[in-house]
Amino acid sequence: MSREGWIGIFLITILMFLWTLWLAHSARPQTPQKENPVPTDSIEKTTPATEDRPEQALDIGPYARFIGLPESVLVVQTPLYRAFFRTTGAALMSLELTRYQDASGKPVTLWDERQKSELTFAEGRYLIPLHKLSFEVTYLPKTPIEKAPDSAVFRLTLAKDTFIQVVYRFQPEDYHIEREIIFQNFNDRLRNPYLVHHVIIETPQTERSASLMQPYTALYYRQGEDVDYLQPDEDEKIEKTFQGNIYWISAKGHFFTQLFRNDAGYSAVTLRSLPFSKGELPKYEITLQLPMEEGRLRESLYLGPLRYTYLKKYGRDYEKQLNLGWSFIRYINTGFIIPVFQVLEKYIPSYGIIIAILALLVKILLSPLTWQSYLAGARMQVINELPEVKALDEKYKDDPNKLMMEKSLLYRELGVNPLSGCIPLLLQMPLFFAMVSFFPSAFELRQESFLWAKDLSTYDDLIRWGFHIPILGEHISLFALMTALTTLAYTLLSPQSTSTTTPGMKWLPYLTPVIFFLFLNSYSAALSWYYTVLNILTITQTLIMRRMVDKEAIIQKLRQRRQKRSNAGVMRQSVPRWLRQAGKRR
């Protein structure tokens, strides 16, 4: 290929590299009518009131007697999670997912003592901290909840018919926990028709490295019909305030999220991302104003995986938290790649094989473009071997501008475009970007092993050492190395590489695999495996096409074209003016 062609390929590679770096940093339910007695086996432990608790000094009027009472911890279990609730504040204490493990093999914990949830409301002159008041358990479901929805009910009784009731509703196969707070017979006692929910969230480390998780963390929110996000910053506090029209807020991790939702819309929201150190995960402060209607308010909490199929079924734009690329790229992922995965995973247990089949399907779809690109490269190889071209190289070896102009004239006489081989590559770039976006965000690949890789969602590190090497890191990914080697093999095999006559451009075929290796070395092993398979298929395809291409027929066809376009005056006028002027200046 000509120098211009190799420059085009090199720039495409650099663009892919820079883009991926940037990407790494972008009906009311019924309340239970019957209150069953609480089964004692659901009460895990009881803790006495702490002595000299400062809450006892709070000026909260008639609610002071509900401070500092003994606390019970209750357990609710479904097929998806195990949740612990405390009677103090009728609050969620911790939640662990039973189907997923963290890097140490323990259940993924998405809520624990590091997370804080504080509810306050105003009554008369008092500001009441609901999260510090002691409730009684009036109904607790028999667990595990496996067949039908069920509820847990907590109550704080002020008078015979005046009470605060907190109801949690659970579904057997749903990661949502719905909470309803009822102020019964409060009439005009509440100063404001809302509660304030203040939340402090520390992003839980669910994967093996916090530094690898950090680029995928953000605070997402849905405002009206749009989903946007607040990107945390290591060095400064970031704050956003909204008035109404916010329907959910999500502290997104890499593969799991903690999401709060109010279908009526939060009447006011403040989001804060706090500074954090390198190698740590972000910490957020969220203040939500929950509107109350007829003494009732509702809020849902989603603590679960960021799997596209789960998020999409809720119909609330949860899936827009997943970084699947820009609008057009996203359509490729949601319209082609994800559906293919959904179909294949029903029949094939190995995701490594699924990825290989996906590469085969992509190669079949791109075969027409690959054929056109190969033909263009073969034509340029034949042209560069013509005596006329070699004579031009020798005649103008000291005058590159003149050589460029004369070659451009010759190419036009032959009816070829030296950059035509790059056009099919450009058309394939959206698919490349889609794959780069999809694989690191694909929950399906999390902790899925293949060959020597223990987790396809991150890099494989079979070869590693105990110190950091700049750019390379502390390991070598064998999948990334395979991608680099197969890329080099394909590049050297293609006709473009053999047609590079400019001495300064001959290093480009070797630089491209190096760039790919350095990037993929700390990237998803699934992406490296995908491109390894794709390269092997491309090499096989190239060997087949090489047998199909007749160089003598190409030469004959080129000479026929030249004969038809033999008017040199016209051809010389067709040379770009800037190129002719450059030749004259020399």
Language-model features, listed with the residues they occupy:
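Soluble non-transmembrane domains of integral membrane proteins
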Residues: 73-321
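Juxtamembrane extramembrane loops of integral membrane proteins
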Residues: 12, 25-104, 110, 114, ...
